């Protein structure tokens, strides 16, 4: 009879544990990155009254007689299903769409989390502002004048250098991929200024030297009076004539020749121009600068000047220089690349956020602050970039909500409550039976 008392006690204790887990799930229903827990029960050892016997010629076999001695908690699992995303419109708020974890560092210790409410501290580190832990990834490094992110190197603290300067870069090339309207009228001798304006295609482009001084390129193009599909171009720098050249097109509107020299299909037609850069002071003449005008590829319509009966365009004209600028803002793309946005219009890759994965994420241990730590049963951490081995993508401007389903938790709460009540009834009923035994003495 005493066994039923202890079975009831084990039921009370373990249903209380289950209620604790359910209560914690409900408490964290609005905790970003939280992963719900689940309690599984199993029965305890059973006491054997008699063992099983095998069949004989005279009798059949018998089954064992066993009395269970209660139950205990088999496991308390952490369920790592994807939570829904909540939009925040804040660039440093991040969520993972996939199985990866953000990596945080405190001293020499690494922690892993799905809670991506990050910010930039006074030292310009990307951190979790709740505890100061630093987000890990890879910073871009200078390689032959270009910023390169080496994801094969060790992870490090990520720095977002708000306010840093980006030096000026001199213009080396001006690339044209615009259209000259074949319908433009010819400019006859003695034409009026209005007729000249109607028959001239004009484009202006700012050019930069290594100090950020600006010179203005003006290109004026008119139809040749005598030769079909031929255009005469004049280059002006800062209002002064610099050079002249001619452009020829085939009968299908594609670029064909430069200065009367026909090119082979696929040839790039370009012409250098040299000029004196305007200095910073009025009247000051700077050093000479040479800029290459890339007019296009012979026979190409996509990356060349063309001649079609459509409006002349100036949109597809690009120069590769810029003045000095300051980093004003940043954004993070779905690959985890942190892109700096500068006041001079330049965008620079600053670094990349690393993600971690585990063979058995259920083996991770919760360490507080919605963080996890590696254990002997989680498997060793595997660190990589987004998109690899199921790590998933990074979403900027969102936070992952808890994966707690309140309807499920309330149902589990009711079942747990009834289980607790039933075990309590087992104890009170066993107590009544003991009282009957005591009364037999009287």
Where are the predicted features?
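Small/polar low-complexity and glycine-rich loop motifs
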Residues: 2, 35, 39-403, 408-412, ...
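Alpha-helix capping and helix-loop boundary segments enriched in small/acidic/polar residues
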Residues: 10-17, 32, 401, 411-414, ...
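Acidic/polar, glycine-anchored loop/turn motif associated with catalytic or activation segments
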Residues: 423
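N-terminal intrinsically disordered, low-complexity, charge/repeat-rich segments that act as generic
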Residues: 1-39, 43
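Structured functional modules or segments
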Residues: 433-442
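Conserved functional loop/turn residues at catalytic and ligand-binding sites
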Residues: 30, 398, 441
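Short segments within alpha-helical structural elements
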Residues: 426, 430-434
């Amino acid at each position: 009879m005493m066994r039923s008392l202890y079975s009831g006690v084990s039921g009370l204790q373990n249903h209380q544990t289950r209620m604790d887990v359910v209560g914690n799930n409900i408490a964290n229903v609005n905790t970003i990155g939280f992963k719900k827990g689940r309690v599984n029960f199993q029965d305890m050892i059973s006491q054997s009254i008699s063992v099983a016997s095998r069949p004989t010629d005279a009798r059949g076999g018998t089954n064992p007689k066993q009395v269970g001695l209660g139950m205990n908690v088999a496991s308390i699992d952490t369920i790592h299903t994807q939570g829904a995303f909540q939009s925040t419109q804040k660039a440093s708020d991040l969520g993972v769409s996939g199985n990866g974890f953000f990596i945080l560092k405190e001293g020499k210790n690494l922690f892993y989390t799905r809670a991506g409410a990050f910010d930039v501290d006074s030292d310009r580190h990307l951190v979790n502002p709740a505890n100061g832990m630093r987000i890990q990834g890879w910073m871009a490094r200078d390689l032959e004048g270009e910023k390169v992110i080496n994801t094969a190197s060790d992870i490090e603290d990520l720095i977002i250098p708000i306010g840093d300067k980006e030096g000026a870069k001199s213009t080396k090339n001006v690339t044209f991929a615009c259209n000259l309207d074949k319908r433009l009228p010819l400019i006859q001798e003695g034409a009026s200024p209005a007729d000249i304006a109607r028959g001239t295609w004009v484009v202006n482009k700012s050019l930069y030297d290594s100090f950020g001084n600006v010179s203005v390129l003006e290109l004026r193009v008119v139809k040749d009076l005598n030769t079909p599909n031929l255009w005469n171009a004049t280059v002006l720098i800062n209002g002064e004539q610099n050079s002249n050249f001619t452009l020829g097109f085939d009968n299908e509107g594609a670029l064909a020749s430069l200065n009367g020299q026909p090119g082979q299909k696929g040839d790039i037609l370009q012409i250098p121009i040299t000029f004196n850069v305007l200095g910073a002071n009025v009247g000051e003449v700077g050093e000479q600068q040479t800029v290459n005008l890339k007019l296009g590829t012979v026979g190409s319509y996509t990356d060349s000047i063309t001649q079609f009966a459509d409006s002349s365009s100036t949109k597809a004209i690009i120069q590769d220089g810029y003045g000095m600028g300051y980093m004003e803002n940043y954004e993070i793309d779905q690959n985890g690349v942190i892109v700096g946005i500068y006041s001079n219009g330049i965008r620079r890759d600053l670094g990349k956020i690393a993600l971690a994965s585990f063979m058995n994420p259920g083996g991770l241990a919760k360490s507080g602050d919605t963080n996890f730590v590696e254990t002997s049963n989680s498997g060793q951490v595997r660190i990589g970039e987004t998109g690899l081995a199921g790590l998933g993508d990074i979403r900027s401007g969102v936070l992952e909500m808890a994966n707690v389903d309140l309807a499920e938790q309330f149902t589990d709460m009711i079942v747990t409550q009834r289980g607790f009540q039933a075990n309590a009834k087992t104890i009170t009923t066993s107590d009544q039976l003991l009282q009957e035994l005591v009364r037999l003495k009287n």
